[in-house]
Amino acid sequence: MLGEVIGGKVVKSSKPEIGILDIDFLENKKKDQLFSTFPDKIKSLQWHSYEVQDLENIKSVTLIASSPETKYQIFKFQEHAYGIQFHIEIKDTTVSDWGCVPEYKSALESQLGKGALAKFDNDAKINMSSMNKYSTILYDNFKKLV
């Protein structure tokens, strides 16, 4: 939503980005109050088939992180608003809870094959500790801003 409001477009991705995948931080993160303490690469939970595009020419947008499939994983608009594509707000039951939604399970299986939900859930649990650590860092950094 933020991407469209500031002049970009939300479009269907060339292929859905689903799974526990890498997020690569750019040099801009070093100057950012929320993300400066993050490592250069983190694992994240992705489950989307739309993405923000066309923010390149908006001078007040700073790209902070990308992935191989999605350029705008994290971007900042001016100094007050952030767009985050991946899911940082996860818990142990997120994948299994979302997998109960027939449309979500169908999208998952059409992308990753039958039985993908169990593997995705296991991958999430394996990476849960580090993903929750980054969520806590983000929250703590956010509290310092307000």
Regions inferred by a protein language model and the residue ranges of each:
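Amide-donor transfer/coupling interface in amidating biosynthetic enzymes
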Residues: 11, 25-146
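Cysteine-nucleophile active-site neighborhood
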Residues: 1-29
